[in-house]
A protein has these predicted regions:
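A domain-level signal for the structural core that forms small-molecule/cofactor-binding pockets
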Residues: 1-62
């Protein structure tokens, strides 16, 4: 049973997250895995809690 964990910045709409979940599930279906066996977990992280090159992402991408 594949489990895909996505870490991304907070702020996407419910529709956008649903699109990501459907797309990942479809990719697994294309290689023969039933959709009911695919789990997708989205962790939303505030930009202030995400570091890039020693800086907070909220400062790099305001």
């Amino acid at each position: 049973m594949p489990t895909v964990i996505i870490e991304m910045w907070a702020g996407r709409t419910e529709e956008q997250k649903a699109t990501v979940i459907r797309g990942i599930t479809k990719a697994f279906e294309e290689i023969g895995i039933k959709s009911e066996h695919v789990q997708v977990i989205i962790h939303e992280v505030p930009r202030s809690n995400w570091g890039i090159g020693g800086e907070q992402a909220s400062k790099i991408f305001p």
